[in-house]
């Protein structure tokens, strides 16, 4: 498995990805500002109508805390909308990163290691300077998105998928896959034997 883009989480906030996602969610009625109870002052997404979350005692997910801090799940929703090409500005243009060349690389065969520093393939990184255009084909706008993330993120990834669905993009939600992996703990003795 290889990849061609390193994204900087800070760019999601600096470039207004979350702000735009927030506006889309708010305007669609997918989130609400709590005015009482334990979540007072928080922006929450209600999951009560989703069969996926039907058995939960508290099916509300906080996306913005009362102090204004955006949660990881909120940022993940914005990032997922970008990955799917659904983070669109009011003028119809896609909200996007700036891009900067990071490294070139090559790989002789799928099972061979990647060699950085030479080769024809490019590894780019995001930047908050949107004047720096994508080198080659644009990123984002995928038909399917596979998020390879630790199994401990299963619940937030379900929330991300549901956010895409409640915005009216059922096909995109169905094509949003959390490809989870488990963590392995090795004893020092086991590590020495490896």
Regions inferred by a protein language model and the residue ranges of each:
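Alpha-helical recognition segments enriched in aromatics with Gly/Pro capping
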Residues: 1-194
């Amino acid at each position: 498995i290889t990849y061609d883009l390193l994204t900087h989480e800070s760019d999601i906030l600096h470039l207004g990805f979350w702000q735009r996602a927030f506006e889309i969610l708010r305007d669609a009625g997918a989130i609400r500002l709590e005015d009482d109870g334990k979540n007072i002052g928080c922006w929450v997404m209600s999951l009560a109508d989703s069969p996926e979350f039907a058995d939960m005692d508290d099916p509300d997910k906080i996306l913005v805390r009362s102090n204004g801090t955006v949660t990881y799940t909120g940022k993940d929703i914005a990032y997922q909308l970008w990955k799917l090409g659904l983070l669109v500005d009011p003028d119809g243009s896609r909200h996007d990163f700036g891009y900067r060349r990071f490294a070139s690389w090559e790989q002789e065969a799928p099972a061979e290691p990647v060699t950085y520093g030479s080769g024809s393939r490019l590894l780019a990184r995001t930047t908050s300077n949107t004047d720096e255009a994508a080198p080659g084909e644009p990123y984002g706008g995928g038909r399917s998105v596979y998020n390879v993330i630790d199994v401990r993120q299963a619940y937030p990834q379900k929330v991300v998928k549901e956010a895409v669905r409640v915005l009216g993009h059922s096909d995109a939600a169905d094509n949003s896959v959390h490809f989870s992996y488990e963590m392995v703990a090795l004893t020092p003795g086991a590590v020495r034997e490896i």
